[in-house]
């Protein structure tokens, strides 16, 4: 009976183990998770903090006991894999509660350890990062125990923006700082202006090109020379892959600690697969490497690896499109395709349109800005971005499907929209992009 060991029990690892069990009722499957919880919804965490998700239990899909009862898969939390011996096909495991170490053998090894939040490195009792449900609980408990009012949010990526919005909606008073003027980097820089407008509208203070210089209790000294007092600091300054323990093996790592995989999510070492934030692959629509640490990729990889292990060796990953979206107060920001800083590798043209998300005479209309970049040599779409109060998600998902099927920008004129006045136009924004490109 084959023995499958999975490292990490969140989106990628738990999903992969579950899919294997669906296809294979006999294999012995064991998951090691270094933290307290398994199968929690990472993307729900800011909304748990904001009390939009009314009960944290809704963010926790399974406990180890429930997972075993349903699927006959053993999950050991507080068990950290600290080394891999791929020649003997074993992993070294640390029980974080007892400090005992032991070795576990495997026939197949699936690595899904995820990423950890970067820290600014200040010694302070008021600083927090947000990576898992334990962090969420700590933030929530600190807010309640200390009657927190003023919160400094450091960083302006999509998670920080979600956290800031949820703190505000909870009734707290957040301030945002970011070390450069480049916020929400997955979006075109000039399309991020509504973020600043939404902050101004709510009189939420923010400073770009600003950093913390020192923390002394609740007194924060900034690089600008300003000194301010805050009850709490939440750092959202990026992540790094949890790959240190992999250095003990023969698995190839890139210079940033990510693991290159093939289209079966195999590493360079036999019988070892990698899924989730730690894996790096390639784009689907262009010949460039891609690392897309988002939920869809982890779930897709989990299914492909499960199929491979269950015996379907014909299934392969065709690449990322990098589809992403974030809500910030009244606006939605979405994009798909290569990142803005990767466009310089192509000879491209850009076409854009701004018009109402639905028929102008129907109430509640608001502008939607849609932009498409296409390759001048074959006129295929390289990237698209959309910003608006409604309809951005629909347009980006349609363009994602167009890119998946290698449609040209001209073929967007043939897109048949589901039209009624509350939803769109007879000639939709996507059609208009195609016409303008001609």
From Swiss-Prot:
<keyword id="KW-0274">FAD</keyword>
<dbReference type="InterPro" id="IPR016156">
    <property type="entry name" value="FAD/NAD-linked_Rdtase_dimer_sf"/>
</dbReference>
<feature type="active site" description="Redox-active">
    <location>
        <position position="43"/>
    </location>
</feature>
<feature type="binding site">
    <location>
        <position position="71"/>
    </location>
    <ligand>
        <name>substrate</name>
    </ligand>
</feature>
<feature type="binding site">
    <location>
        <position position="42"/>
    </location>
    <ligand>
        <name>substrate</name>
    </ligand>
</feature>
<dbReference type="InterPro" id="IPR017758">
    <property type="entry name" value="CoA_disulphide_reductase"/>
</dbReference>
<dbReference type="GO" id="GO:0050661">
    <property type="term" value="F:NADP binding"/>
</dbReference>
<comment type="similarity">
    <text>Belongs to the class-III pyridine nucleotide-disulfide oxidoreductase family.</text>
</comment>
<dbReference type="InterPro" id="IPR004099">
    <property type="entry name" value="Pyr_nucl-diS_OxRdtase_dimer"/>
</dbReference>
<protein>
    <recommendedName>
        <fullName>Coenzyme A disulfide reductase</fullName>
        <ecNumber>1.8.1.14</ecNumber>
    </recommendedName>
</protein>
<feature type="binding site">
    <location>
        <begin position="267"/>
        <end position="277"/>
    </location>
    <ligand>
        <name>FAD</name>
    </ligand>
</feature>
<feature type="binding site">
    <location>
        <position position="19"/>
    </location>
    <ligand>
        <name>substrate</name>
    </ligand>
</feature>
<feature type="binding site">
    <location>
        <position position="39"/>
    </location>
    <ligand>
        <name>substrate</name>
    </ligand>
</feature>
<comment type="function">
    <text>Catalyzes specifically the NADPH-dependent reduction of coenzyme A disulfide.</text>
</comment>
<dbReference type="InterPro" id="IPR023753">
    <property type="entry name" value="FAD/NAD-binding_dom"/>
</dbReference>
<comment type="subunit">
    <text>Homodimer.</text>
</comment>
<dbReference type="InterPro" id="IPR036188">
    <property type="entry name" value="FAD/NAD-bd_sf"/>
</dbReference>
<keyword id="KW-0285">Flavoprotein</keyword>
<dbReference type="InterPro" id="IPR050260">
    <property type="entry name" value="FAD-bd_OxRdtase"/>
</dbReference>
<feature type="binding site">
    <location>
        <position position="427"/>
    </location>
    <ligand>
        <name>substrate</name>
    </ligand>
</feature>
<keyword id="KW-0521">NADP</keyword>
<keyword id="KW-0676">Redox-active center</keyword>
<dbReference type="GO" id="GO:0050660">
    <property type="term" value="F:flavin adenine dinucleotide binding"/>
</dbReference>
<feature type="active site" description="Nucleophile">
    <location>
        <position position="43"/>
    </location>
</feature>
<feature type="binding site">
    <location>
        <begin position="151"/>
        <end position="166"/>
    </location>
    <ligand>
        <name>NADP(+)</name>
    </ligand>
</feature>
<dbReference type="InterPro" id="IPR023536">
    <property type="entry name" value="CoA_disulphide_reductase_staph"/>
</dbReference>
<dbReference type="Pfam" id="PF02852">
    <property type="entry name" value="Pyr_redox_dim"/>
</dbReference>
<dbReference type="GO" id="GO:0050451">
    <property type="term" value="F:CoA-disulfide reductase (NADPH) activity"/>
</dbReference>
<feature type="binding site">
    <location>
        <begin position="8"/>
        <end position="33"/>
    </location>
    <ligand>
        <name>FAD</name>
    </ligand>
</feature>
<feature type="binding site">
    <location>
        <position position="22"/>
    </location>
    <ligand>
        <name>substrate</name>
    </ligand>
</feature>
<feature type="binding site">
    <location>
        <position position="419"/>
    </location>
    <ligand>
        <name>FAD</name>
    </ligand>
</feature>
<keyword id="KW-0560">Oxidoreductase</keyword>
<dbReference type="Pfam" id="PF07992">
    <property type="entry name" value="Pyr_redox_2"/>
</dbReference>
<feature type="binding site">
    <location>
        <position position="299"/>
    </location>
    <ligand>
        <name>substrate</name>
    </ligand>
</feature>
<feature type="binding site">
    <location>
        <position position="15"/>
    </location>
    <ligand>
        <name>substrate</name>
    </ligand>
</feature>
<dbReference type="GO" id="GO:0003756">
    <property type="term" value="F:protein disulfide isomerase activity"/>
</dbReference>
